């Protein structure tokens, strides 16, 4: 038999085998259902342990299903177990969690979700704001430092309040001291009261206080091209910028030292948040009417410090305080 003929016969045999495998693969049914992961928070602390379980996979014949798990980039191989326990590392980043459901004679299905490791503090998730270089001093509530600085004739706190009322970002408690919390109108006033000491009195700033701040910053062109650029911090969250460059605003400089972060706003009833990377919103002490209060806000792509109204009970904004 010639070599060419042998090669031809071999190719035909391989093609038949391949076709048979394709037919087998195509004829293998999938497990039923949509596999999801139960017990995984969106944000976790360094070293936090979680216990995860699968939900939604169904065997068409009621047979046994085998589950396997993998967390990347921490794991290179799947671990076969139904209820999976995992301790996240101290590295601040987003991890992908996979769960695979398989059964003999069926094509497996996979569920996937994410968890981000976050931490507060100078070496934490927020970088780009050097509070110790900007601030004049610090006041503590429990273990949490609140930095403050004199801007013009006023003394302002430089980081968002995080005392335990209001709601945290996406209702994740571990984010409380990272972005600060979102408070309704009445909670905002109480948050500033928590800073009071024997020698210092702190209050929620009025509209007039904010307007004084605005006039001082806009009168100092060295702070930045616009008030938005001068008040927003060039902050990053786990290495990702919280801001984009807009020619109308100019380079984000934080020249005033105010260190605003565009972390959006909340519905304190639904415990949901929106507008991150777009708005930095702060309550004032002034009522607009019986059901609404005034707030001040920055928009990442627009120059100006604007005024809005929010429901006293359900609208959640960040809080800064002024020393009186």
Where do the model's predicted regions map?
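Bacterial Sec-dependent N-terminal signal peptides
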Residues: 3-6, 11-41, 106, 110-134, ...
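A short beta-strand segment in extracellular, disulfide-stabilized domains
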Residues: 43-58
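Coil residues (strongly favoring Ser/Thr
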Residues: 49, 80, 91, 137-138, ...
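Solvent-exposed loop segments of extracellular immunoglobulin-like
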Residues: 58-68
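Surface-exposed, flexible coil segments in extracellular/virion-facing regions
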Residues: 68-87
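Surface-exposed, short loops/turns at beta-strand junctions within beta-sandwich domains
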Residues: 88-94
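Conserved positions within compact, well-structured domain cores
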Residues: 120-324
